[in-house]
Amino acid sequence: MAWVTRSPLIQETPVKSRREFIRSAAGIGIGLAAGLPEALAQQPAPGAAPATGAAQDLNLVNGRIHTFDARNSVVSSVAIRNGRIASAGNSAPARTANTRVIDLRGRTVVPGLIEGHVHIVSLANRPGYHTILENTTSIREIQEALAARRKSVPEGQWITSMGGWHTNQWSEHRYPTLKELDEAVPDRPVLLYERFTGPAITNSAGKKIFDALDAGAPVHPDIKKVAAADNGAIAAAGFAGGGPAASALFHLRRTQTFEDKKRSTIDAMAYAASVGLTAHLDEVLFPTPGPLHPNQILSNLDQYRMYDSWLALHREGKTIIRLQMNFLQNQNDPALPELKERLRNQFQFFGDDMMMTGSIGEWAAPLGAGAVWREAQRLVAEAGWRNENSVQNLAALQQVVEAYEAVNKQYDITKLRWMVHHVPEVTPDLLNRLKAMGCGVQMGAFRWVTSNDPKVIVGPPFRTIADNGIQVGIHGDGVHIAPLNPWLHIYFAVTGVNSFGAKVNGDQQLTRQEALRLFTRGNSWFLRMEDKIGSIEAGKLADLVVLDRDYFTVPDVQIKQIKSLMTIVDGKIVHGVL
C-alpha cells in the first residue's frame, strides 16, 4: 500500500452560527464534517497514519489530462507502471490482473506542481501543532480552522500557526484578539506568529504560560520577556537582538522533541500534497548553526541539523514529496571559510529522486557584501556549481548580471544553470545578457501578499520575462513571507489582483496555460530534472494531480480555491482517493 495522507493542518468543519460556534468550541470541540468555506477546505479531514509500500500499476481513464508536453496535448488516459508513465493517450491502456483502474469521470489532471523557490524544510521544523491559515480570508475562518485543529491536538500542547499568512488576506485586516482565540480554543495554548519576526498573538491559556515564564527564573541568560498584553498581543522581535516574539518562539522550540519534528515534517509533506505540490527546491534561509538561542527568529535554523527529521523519514521510506536542498551561505567573512568547505567537501545533486542535495542558493554570500559577494560568485564558478541570487530591485539585478559576466570571462558558466530569483523589475537588455550566459529567471509571484496600495506596481513583469525566451519559472517563496499554496500565486500571475481586489501588476499577466506550465515543466529545469518530472509523458516519473475543478475554465476567483482530489508521486497515491 502506498503512503496516503490526509493532512491534519486544516480540518473541515460545518458552518455554524456564532452562538453555535462558541458553544461547540467551549465544549468538546467542533466535529469534522463537510461544508467548510472553500478558502479553508484545502484538504480532507485527517485519517490514519499512512503506510509505506511499492508503486502500484495504475490506469487513469476518462479524464481531461493536460500533459504539458511540447504540443500541450490533452489526452483521456494515462498508464503508470513501476512508478513511471508508461503511456499517455486516448486509447484504453492495456491492463493485467494487478492493474488498478481509476475512472476520472471527466476530471482535470495536470502534472505535479514544482516549487522552484521555497522554504518547506522550515515548515517541517515548526514547533507545536502547526495549523495552516494561509487560505483563510476572515477572523471567522481563522477561528473555525483553529477549533477544528484542536480536535487532534493533545491536551496541554500548543496549537500554532507560524508564517505563510498576512493580515492583508483577512477581510478585517487585523489580528484576531485574545478573546476571539479563546472562543475558538479555550483549553489549549495558541500562538500565531507572522512572517520572520512577528508580531504574534496568543490566547488566555498561552498568556498564562508566558506570564509564568516571564515571572520565573530566566531559562536563558539572554532571553527577554514575552510580555503578552491583555489582548494577547506580543510585540515583534528585531532581526538581531531578539525581542518578545522571538522569546515566545524560543520557549516553544526548546521543548520540541525529535518525534515532534517528525510529526511536523509529515504534516508539511501532507499539506503540500493536498495542494498538488510534488517537488520542491528548498532555499534554507538565514542559517544559524549551534544551539538554540532566544535571539533567533522564525527563519533561523541550524543548517546542519534542520534536515534530520526529513532524512529520518526518508530512511523509513515515508517521504511522499520530492525535495532538493540548496545551501545558503550567509557569511561576510572575506575568507568565506564555510563556502569554501562546502564547495570542497559537499556533492551537489547527491541522493535519489525523492531527496537530494541541490547547489548554492539562494545566495553564496549576502548581496550587500561587495567584494566578498563577488569573490563568492567566483568560487562557485571555479567549483563548477550551480548558483543562485535573489534580487529585490533593478539595481541588485544589474549588480548580479555584471558579476555573472565578469565570472563568465574566467570560467564558463553557460552550462551550469546559474539563476536569478524574484526579479520584481527587469529590462530587455538585462534579460538578453542573462540569456546569453545560459541563465534562468525564477519569477516571484508572492508580492500580492503585502500589496495594499493600488497605485504601486509590485511585479514581477511576468509577460515581459516570459516573452523574452529566457529559461523561466515561477515560485511563491513560502512559507515565511508568503503562502505555500501555489494556486494563490497562480491566481496573481493570471490576474494581477492583490488581496484587496486591486490590480497591481499592470498588463503583465500570464495566460492560465502559461502560468501552470511554468509551475510544472518550467520549474523542472531549475531542479535539473526536466527529463524526469514536469510533464505527463512516457518514461517520466509518475507525478500527477487530479484537481477538484477545471483550472482552465472556472471563474478567476475559484483558482484560489483549487485543491487536489488525488495526488500521485512516483506512481504512489500519496493524497486523497477517487
Whereabouts are the PLM-identified features?
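Acidic (Asp/Glu)-rich catalytic clusters
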Residues: 344-354, 411, 434-436
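Non-cysteine beta-strand/loop elements that form the S-adenosyl-L-methionine
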Residues: 352-362, 439-446
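N-terminal secretory signal peptides
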Residues: 1-20, 30, 34, 40
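Signal peptide processing junction and immediate N-terminal pro/mature segment
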Residues: 38-48
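Internal alpha-helical transmembrane segments of multi-pass membrane proteins, especially GPCRs
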Residues: 23-26
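Divalent metal-binding segments
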Residues: 29-31, 50-61, 66, 70-341, ...
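His/Asp/Glu-enriched, well-ordered alpha-helical/loop segment
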Residues: 378-388, 392-418, 422-424, 428-435, ...
